[in-house]
Amino acid sequence: KCSRVAQLEQILPVLSMLLFFSGNRKDDYMEATPYLIGQLLKASDELHALYCKVVRNNQIPPQLVGSALFVAASETPGRTLSQLSVRMAPYLSWAKQYRTKNEDSSGLAGWYLKVFEQIANKLATAYAVPMRWSDAQKAQLFIGYLASFPKQEKQDESNAE
């Protein structure tokens, strides 16, 4: 599995360069719907895995919710978001309750909820899902799925003083 992660980490810069040279700039595509849906799928995987660790005694299925819907997202993005909302509902509900408990991973559950909220807020302003995506949009989806989550903007708070 580690070699797969290493391979994916090598692919990400190549895809980013291809998008750059085709006129798709990072600052633009990181706010675009395909990238954000990729991030949503990634967040879904992470929350699902946390749920399995906490509730199912570390019994993690071979395929998590986000990765199970990744191919469908590249083919029928609107339908996939609908499916994702249904499949993630129990995990999101669990996280909302679990984050208030004083347990080891409860803070992480709250952090994932915050990630979902940030992505949803961006999607609310950028949401435009065509019936099919172009190859460039599929690349943005993939990059969004592989990219790390945005860091907390603590510098902005200290600069505001």
For each of these PLM feature ranges, what is it?
Residues 1-161:
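Intrinsic-disorder/low-complexity detector
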